[in-house]
Regions:
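N-terminal Sec signal peptide and the immediately downstream disordered periplasmic leader
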Residues: 1-93, 117, 177, 208, ...
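Gram-negative outer-membrane beta-barrel transporters
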Residues: 43, 357-359, 398-402, 505-507, ...
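Acidic, small-polar-rich N-terminal luminal/periplasmic segments of exported/outer-membrane proteins
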Residues: 45-179, 458, 495
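Periplasmic-side early beta-strands and strand-to-turn transitions of outer-membrane beta-barrels
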Residues: 175-176, 184-191, 195-294
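Outer-membrane beta-barrel signature, preferentially recognizing the C-terminal barrel domain
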Residues: 182, 289-308, 338-340, 426-439, ...
Length: 686
């Protein structure tokens, strides 16, 4: 942790410094090469080559057993929102925690929080977004190169707790392979956008340059929004004055982020580093005058040695260190201050192939310190230490492949209490979670493929599940931890069938998660003000399906495609027979796409069913239909490759509420989904 003290001065880095440092480091090297044409060709090729999925794919294969979704390039620009959760919302099996337009995490198969692993370039992403729904994530879609979503629990390299799946955000800051030849070059992109619904003004710049021996990277982004428009009149009280308008009160935001990074390449590997900063000031929407000012600074180191002698052919290491803080303000007055500092190290070795057997094994170390000081602190200061060892093996067969994985962890959670606050009691708990996974892939016939996964997972309770004791304003309840919680255990089954013929494809996934002691926040005194809830272990079951496909309706000078998608999850507390809360309803969607040369257009519709399966005392959510449309054009502009794009969201300005948002229950009617909005943008690449 000593290095954190050295990292401390980075807190004062502003966007101007990020730009200045990055450009001063990069431009001299780039200009000296004079190889702009080479960079332009590389950038264009990068658009056409589909990258190999890296998440949960340590062996670099083209066929994955775990159900996987990848979003990048023009598709990512078309669906990009201000949060990662809303950007991915609508993918098969993926919903969001929607806490207004500024704070939203992905929900996979009805599971959220720490049951979803959110990674940055395959390494841990440290923030406090899983602690509370009003805490934003420290990454912005404007600087994302692509996102990989793995559904299901079998990816044990990233933790046995990720029962729902893994979301890996790839930003390309540390390059693992050279982008240029020995003559060198420069490549980059500039993105600018505007949206009518929240008056969003956004922009981003990404630059890479170097030779076949090194790469330098700099990026920066800015996004400013006003209160988002909604399809109904809402009241807003600020400074004692109440007004009414068709906007969501206290939903404005101001966000900046940037990074400088570099990689050095040698004959048998690479070594890279990046330094990034993220700052955001946004309204929390649940309360009219509460805002959060956040900043996060991160150092990342990464390297790999290849072509080794002995039992391993390569060794890869990743190290990250994060210093995160946010302050909650009420009517401009600083209140509770949340801090977390963490560092993580992963070392992974790939074994020499033994016949048809290939695999990796690794070690992972995670340390994090948490503190919250102020009147709204509901969890004490704590420290979490985690050590883990894991292995993943694959055996190739004539008909497909088999996989097996195992992970064992040592987790220690210490509560230090808070000086002068009697309700926070010091304590210490230790756990040894173990998880196992089996998978198989069959090429059952030409164009047909079947997958199956079975896993047994264990998750150690988080510090707030053990030691929380106080009012949680974001959820409007008093949260009481349970220091006697045991490991959360689950048995998980996943089965999939996929078909592909040219541009036609279809797939379906069936899954079930069976928990013997699911950690749930259960009401223990609902008559209190605020209601009292305690973390309790119950039996629970999640069962559901995901399906999607594409049909090429017209092939020729024009192409017409019909995409379809559907999903549903049913989650129950089987100890009480009650449904579990905040589960998305069944969804059915369809998109018609037309393409001609550089032009692409689409019209889509998504139907969200009513969610009547809610626990006693909670509100049902009505069904609704959302229409959308989009258009893009690729062209040349001043010698650069240009992508012009436009997207119309909620075209009919439909009033709708999210069943997976806590706000639908805690402040009924106050936070509808955004209304009609048109976003236009331009991305230049060179």
């Amino acid at each position: 942790m000593k290095f954190l003290k050295k990292l401390g001065p980075v807190r004062t880095v502003r966007m101007a410094q990020v730009w200045g440092m990055g450009l001063s480091a990069t431009l001299p090297a780039l200009v000296s090469t004079g190889a702009w044409a080479q960079a332009s060709a590389t950038a264009e090729e990068g658009q056409t080559l589909a990258p190999v999925v890296v998440t949960g794919n340590p062996l670099g294969g083209n066929e994955l057993i775990a159900p996987t979704e990848q979003v990048g390039g023009a598709e990512l620009r078309q669906r990009s929102q201000s949060t990662l959760g809303e950007t991915l919302n609508g993918l098969p099996g993926v919903s969001s925690t929607y806490f207004g337009p500024n704070a939203s995490r992905p929900v996979i198969r009805g599971l959220d929080g720490d049951r979803i692993a959110v990674l940055n370039n395959g390494a841990a992403n440290t923030d406090l977004s899983s602690l509370s729904y009003d805490h934003a994530m420290t990454m912005d879609p404007l600087l994302i190169e692509r996102v990989e979503v793995l559904r299901g629990p079998g990816v044990l390299e990233y933790g046995g707790s990720a029962v729902g799946g893994v979301v890996n955000v790839i930003d390309g800051r540390i390059q693992r392979e050279a982008l240029f030849d020995d003559q060198g070059g420069i490549t980059g992109k500039v993105d600018a956008g505007y949206a009518t619904g929240n008056k969003e003004q956004s922009g981003a710049v990404v630059l890479d340059g170097g030779t076949n021996r090194y790469n330098l990277h700099v990026d920066a982004m800015s996004r400013r929004t006003d209160d988002v428009s909604v399809p109904k009149d809402l009241s807003c009280t600020k400074g004692g004055v109440t007004t009414t308008s068709r906007t969501l009160c206290n939903s404005a935001s101001d966000t900046q982020s940037g990074a400088i990074a570099g990689s050095v390449f040698f004959d048998r590997g690479y070594l890279g580093a990046s330094l990034s900063t993220y700052e955001s000031n946004y309204g929390t929407v649940a309360e009219d005058e509460v805002t959060i000012k956040m900043r996060s600074n991160k150092l990342a180191l990464e390297g790999e040695l290849r072509d080794l002698q002995g039992p391993f052919q390569s060794v890869k290491a990743q190290y990250g260190q994060t210093d995160y803080q946010h302050t909650e303000f009420e009517a401009g007055v600083a209140g509770t201050v949340f801090n977390t500092r963490g560092q993580d190290l992963r070392v992974q070795a790939r074994q020499v192939r033994w016949g048809q057997l290939d695999g990796v094994m690794g070690l992972q170390f995670d340390d994090s310190d948490f503190s919250a000081v102020g009147t709204e602190a509901y969890a004490p200061s704590s420290k979490t230490l985690q050590r883990a060892a894991y292995a993943h093996e694959e055996y190739a067969t004539t008909w497909g492949k088999l996989s097996a994985g195992a992970r064992v962890e040592s987790v220690k959670v210490d509560s230090y209490g808070v000086a002068g606050v009697a309700r926070f009691v010091p304590g210490s708990r230790s756990f040894t979670p173990t998880s196992y996974a089996l998978g198989s892939l069959w090429n059952v016939a030409t164009e047909w493929q079947m997958t199956a996964n079975l896993s047994a997972n264990e998750r150690a309770p988080k510090h707030y599940e053990l030691y929380a004791n106080g009012e949680h304003v974001a959820t409007n309840v008093e949260e009481i931890g349970n220091a006697n919680l045991d490991l959360e255990r689950s048995v998980n089954v996943d089965w999939g069938l996929a078909w592909k013929r040219g541009a036609h494809n279809a797939r379906v996934q069936l899954f079930q998660h069976q928990f013997s002691n699911y950690i749930s926040l259960e009401g223990t005194d609902l008559s209190a003000t605020p209601p009292q809830y305690t973390y309790t272990q119950v039996q629970a079951r999640f069962v559901g399906f995901e399906a999607s496909g594409n049909a090429r309706l017209l092939q020729g000078h024009d192409t017409v495609d019909w995409n379809w998608r559907a999903d549903q999850v049913q989650a129950d507390n089987t100890s009480t027979g009650q449904p579990l809360p905040r589960i998305a309803p069944y969804r059915v969607g369809s998109t018609l796409r037309w393409g001609r040369g550089a032009w692409n257009t689409r019209v889509g519709v998504d139907y969200y069913g009513a969610q009547n399966r809610v626990p006693d005392g909670q509100l049902a959510t009505g069904g609704y239909t959302l229409w959308s449309a989009g258009m893009s054009l690729t062209s040349k502009l001043g010698g650069y490759s240009a992508l012009w794009y436009a997207r119309l969201d909620n075209a009919t300005d439909t009033l709708a509420y999210s069943a997976s948002s806590i706000l639908t229950q805690t402040v009924p009617g106050k936070v509808p989904l955004p209304g009609r909005s048109l976003k236009v943008g331009l991305q230049l690449q060179f």
